[in-house]
């Protein structure tokens, strides 16, 4: 009796819940599917959440990189402004130094007062130059000097100022008029000027190439002496190269004897003195130096034409 009653109760319960013995297995399978679907949905949701979190982190990193880039660009802009300001200050200083140097150089018109068919070609590479020229009357004679100081730009320009001072002292104050003696006096004076630094352990190895011409128009003669810088004499479609001594001014503490050359002037003679600035220019399709051979050919080609 009790067993029968219990079986009826269980049957009623299954019937109430909609589960009968025939579809019990189906209900379990449906539950499994629901669980799987739920798990999939949960995984998708978690994946989406992780994706969103990763995306947010990446966006944060990108924003930080952009801020860092903006800060770097701002720093670069400020540094560029500072560099431009410094460059302008340096350039302004060099331009002012150029005016000082040019004020010390004689004008081309001054030379043309003596030699109408003459010219000066002076084109500094770095605003100021280590090359210089010097022209001065001495009685009825004329000194013409061309020089190339060691160093470039500012250092060469400072050396050129020293060089002009030494020339003026030798000729105008000490009245040394023989070109070779002027070079010897300059060599000693320049070496003494820089030897003062030797006492503190610093040896300055600076000097200059230089050529000096003393032109005596009354006697129709030129007296030339040089240290490395040559004198070119063009006459009757030929070029005569008169070389200076290979002894740099200021680099030899001993009393050096330089060589004098005496030249008789003839009508239509053309004389050139120059530094190595022109021949050291690079150019052409192979970007090679101009060199002395091309310069000699150029001078032979143009010397028949009027200078002006």
What is each of the regions a protein language model found here?
Residues 27-35, 39, 101:
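Structural motif marking the loop-to-transmembrane transition
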């Amino acid at each position: 009796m009790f067993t029968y009653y219990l079986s009826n109760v269980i049957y009623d319960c299954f019937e109430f819940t909609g589960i009968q013995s025939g579809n019990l297995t189906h209900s379990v399978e449906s539950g499994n599917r629901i669980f799987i679907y739920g798990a999939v949905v949960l995984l998708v949701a978690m994946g989406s959440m992780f994706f969103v979190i990763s995306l947010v982190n990446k966006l944060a990193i990108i924003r930080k990189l952009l801020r860092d880039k903006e800060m770097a660009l701002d720093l670069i802009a400020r540094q560029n402004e500072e560099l431009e300001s410094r460059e302008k200050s340096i350039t302004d200083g060099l331009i002012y130094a150029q005016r000082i140097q040019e004020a010390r150089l004689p004008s081309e018109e001054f030379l043309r007062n003596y030699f109408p068919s003459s010219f000066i070609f002076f084109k500094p590479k770095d605003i100021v130059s280590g090359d210089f020229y010097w022209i001065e009357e001495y009685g009825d004679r004329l000194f013409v000097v061309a020089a190339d100081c060691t160093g470039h730009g500012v250092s060469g320009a400072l050396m050129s100022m020293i060089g002009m001072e030494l020339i003026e002292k030798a000729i105008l104050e000490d009245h040394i008029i023989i070109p070779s003696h002027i070079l010897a006096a300059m060599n000693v004076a320049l070496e003494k000027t820089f030897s003062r630094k030797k006492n503190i352990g610093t040896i300055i190895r600076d000097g200059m190439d230089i050529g000096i011409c003393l032109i005596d128009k009354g006697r129709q003669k030129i007296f030339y002496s040089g240290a490395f810088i040559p004198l070119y004499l063009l006459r009757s479609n030929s070029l005569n190269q008169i070389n200076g001594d290979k002894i740099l001014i200021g680099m030899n503490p001993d009393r050096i004897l330089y060589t004098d050359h005496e030249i008789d002037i003839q009508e239509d003679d053309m004389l050139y003195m120059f530094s190595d600035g022109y021949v050291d220019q690079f150019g052409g399709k192979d970007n090679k130096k101009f060199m002395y051979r091309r310069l000699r050919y150029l001078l032979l080609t143009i010397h028949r034409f009027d200078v002006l």
